[in-house]
Amino acid sequence: MEDDAPVIYGLEFQARALTPQTAETDAIRFLVGTQSLKYDNQIHIIDFDDENNIINKNVLLHQAGEIWHISASPADRGVLATCYNRTSDSKVLTCAAVWRMPKELESGSHESPDDSSSTAQTLELLCHLDNTAHSNMACVVWEPMGDGKKIISLADNHILLWDLQESSSQAVLASSASLGGKGQLKFTSGRWSPHHNCTQVATANDTTLRGWDTRTMSQIYCIENAHGQLVRDLDFNPNKQYYLASCGDDCKVKFWDTRNVTEPVKTLEEHSHWVWNVRYNHSHDQLVLTGSSDSRVILSNMVSISSEPFGHLVDDDDISDQEDHRSEEKSKEPLQDNVIATYEEHEDSVYAVDWSSADPWLFASLSYDGRLVINRVPRALKYHILL
């Protein structure tokens, strides 16, 4: 059973921002934001045609500045948010804004990657997440499963909850909270939990993970020294409401149960440099992706702490007598955690990895040199999980 070869797409600029087009559940589509100091920055809309194993793309101009973070609306295929750098009075500010892509590009393109004659189109600015009080936006996170009207931005040591109004043309600050404590505390990353009616957000600052209740903007849990060095990213298990994964500059990936934060449930030490990204598969939460500046992407099978620790359980009625004994033996033993595959198509730091929102077996990774790689979960494992 041969696995499909990875598909590679090269951007002409450096890049570190990647997101699937979250509201698109039929076509495989990713958005990539570039980081260029000399030229106008771009957002590449990458369409993957999995039948023919080819990539089609469209390019949007993002003239506001180099893109540090990109996220897509969960409700509207045409709306996205970016965090970007701009200079003001010889100071660099990281701002955030919500944009709309041209209508005809929302559902993808049929242009081949080598067609360079086409002209790039521009994004329509919907609103700035006005940051006059806060100068450094780390990321913008949309309310999962929401109507695309609620977003959170992390700026310096503040969490800002925004309501988007008037077709997203206006952002109203609904509530906020800030990190207290000594020194210049600064958020590095955050995720909005899909559980608890979407009332919880987790953030990372320095080596600490914190949970927040968005109704009161108060802290609900705190994991101090979650990592030995800076925490780079975190993600919620989509099927187990108290489970959270984090990664950081100590080269580790840790899994937490937020009801008991004294120590991690599990720790992975497979990378040899900073781990920038961790992502749970949206459907099969034992599949966990990580990307690191060791230039590798690792796919792990964390089945023992997943929602199906005994594999795919079958109803008794479906089992014939001969199979009965075999499946009984199989179901007693939890399956073992292991590294499924290490992907080495990158030659530079991998700053972003993410799963497709349309195909649970497909993911993209992005390295700083502008190389986007699309890979799939090995077929043997896919069938093992499904059957």
Curated annotation (Swiss-Prot):
The modification Phosphoserine is found at S320. WD repeats lie at residues 132-172, 180-222, 226-266, 270-310, 345-385. SUPFAM superfamilies: Putative isomerase YbhE (SSF101908). The keyword Acetylation applies. This is EARP and GARP complex-interacting protein 1. The keyword Phosphoprotein applies. Belongs to the WD repeat EIPR1 family. Residues 310-334 are annotated as: Disordered. Disulfide bonds: none annotated. It is found in: Golgi apparatus, trans-Golgi network. GO terms for biological process: endocytic recycling; positive regulation of endocytic recycling; positive regulation of retrograde transport, endosome to Golgi; protein ubiquitination; regulation of insulin secretion. Interacts with two multisubunit tethering complexes: EARP composed of VPS50, VPS51, VPS52 and VPS53 subunits and GARP complex composed of VPS51, VPS52, VPS53 and VPS54 subunits. Interacts with SNAP29. Residues 322-334 have a biased composition (Basic and acidic residues). Acts as a component of endosomal retrieval machinery that is involved in protein transport from early endosomes to either recycling endosomes or the trans-Golgi network. Mediates the recruitment of Golgi-associated retrograde protein (GARP) complex to the trans-Golgi network and controls early endosome-to-Golgi transport of internalized protein. Promotes the recycling of internalized transferrin receptor (TFRC) to the plasma membrane through interaction with endosome-associated recycling protein (EARP) complex. Keywords: Acetylation, Golgi apparatus, Phosphoprotein, Repeat, WD repeat. The modification N-acetylmethionine is found at M1. One of its GO terms (cellular component) is trans-Golgi network. InterPro entries: EIPR1 (IPR040323), WD40/YVTN_repeat-like_dom_sf (IPR015943), WD40_repeat_CS (IPR019775), WD40_rpt (IPR001680).
